[in-house]
Curated annotation (Swiss-Prot):
It comes from Cuscuta exaltata (Tall dodder). GO terms for cellular component: cytochrome b6f complex; plastid membrane; thylakoid membrane. Belongs to the PetN family. It comes from the Eukaryota. The 4 large subunits of the cytochrome b6-f complex are cytochrome b6, subunit IV (17 kDa polypeptide, PetD), cytochrome f and the Rieske protein, while the 4 small subunits are PetG, PetL, PetM and PetN. The complex functions as a dimer. InterPro entries: Cytochr_b6-f_cplx_su8_sf, Cytochrome_b6-f_cplx_su8. This is Cytochrome b6-f complex subunit 8. It is found in: Plastid membrane. Keywords: Electron transport, Membrane, Photosynthesis, Plastid, Transmembrane, Transmembrane helix, Transport. GO terms for biological process: cytochrome complex assembly; photosynthesis. Component of the cytochrome b6-f complex, which mediates electron transfer between photosystem II (PSII) and photosystem I (PSI), cyclic electron flow around PSI, and state transitions. SUPFAM superfamilies: PetN subunit of the cytochrome b6f complex (SSF103451).
Amino acid sequence: MDIVSLAWAALMIVFTFSLSLVVWGRSGL
């Protein structure tokens, strides 16, 4: 795995985590 695909994977993980955190926060749990 090269550095570009590794950076894309990390970016997708952070984006998915932040998005789910916003949805989870808005649901009031």
